[in-house]
Structure formats: C-alpha cells, structure tokens
Amino acid sequence: MHNGSFFLRHSFDHSIDNSGGYDIGILGNSFSGSSEPGIVWVMQDENGNGLPDDTWYELAGSETGKPETIQNYAVTYYRPSEPKQPVKWTDNQGNSGEIDYLQQFHRQEYYYPLWIEADSYTLTGTCLQARNYDASGNGSYWVNVEYAWGYADNFSPIARLT
C-alpha cells in the first residue's frame, strides 16, 4: 500500500494483544533505499459506537524519544493562486518552503487538495528526521534510508515479516 502523505484507517473485529514483541505488521511498497515511513496510531473502540472517536495512541518506533524527533509538529500548506504552481508551507519550528510543481511527473494542475475549501490547512503529528539524500548529485535519483523498526512502509531488516 502506498499512502502518498495521507492516512489509512482500518478496523479489526478483535483486539490485538500486546505480547511485548512484534504484534502487528503494516507492509507497503518499500525496498532497500526506498522507505516512506508511516507512524502508526491505534485506538480501541471503548464506547462501542464503531466510530474512530476514542483516544488514539501513537505506537513507539525506533526514533521515539530521540532529540531529533519532533513531537507535536505542525505544518501548514497554502493554496497556490494559480494552477501548476508550487505549494508553499510553514511549520511550527520557524521553517518554510515550497513543494515544487513537477509537471513531467503529474498530470493534475494542483498538488493542493481540491476537496479542501480553505486557503490553508494544517497537519499535526510527529516529524521524523529526514534521511533522504540525492545519490545522483543532480536531483534525478533520491535514496530514502530506512529506520530501524516500528513504521509502516519502511524497509527494516528487523521488522521484516519475510
């Protein structure tokens, strides 16, 4: 499963016991040099209404508690004024930038989600330190290095199920 910077919500008809080991695996399309780590959150339907409206808990991964891991991170994206323009962003750490519009890779005119009516939207969560680098030196081949364990769509030698 490739998530594309969004989220997936799935429910089970039973609880998953915490044995202290690897109790759940969420595989994606990762391979060595191409990890897109997703932080996993879980919730128990305590009120029994079948809705995801109870307390959510972030599962610990190998980067939990490290100084370079930012808890309560927030990034705000801004709607471009015209089609085929970069999406500007700011975060709560004082950083800003833009997501380049790459017409050669995508046919849609906007990266900004069309279903969001507001001119900006903010996402909050945990931010892992980036491990990607340009192996080509010219921006044509990027390597996304894996984390040790505990993330979805992450090629971990420890957390592999096969």
Language model: regions and residue ranges:
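Beta-strand signatures of extracellular beta-sandwich domains
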Residues: 39-41
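A domain-level signal for the mature, folded cores of soluble proteins
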Residues: 1-36, 55-162
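Short loop/turn segments immediately following beta-strands, especially the blade-tip
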Residues: 43-49
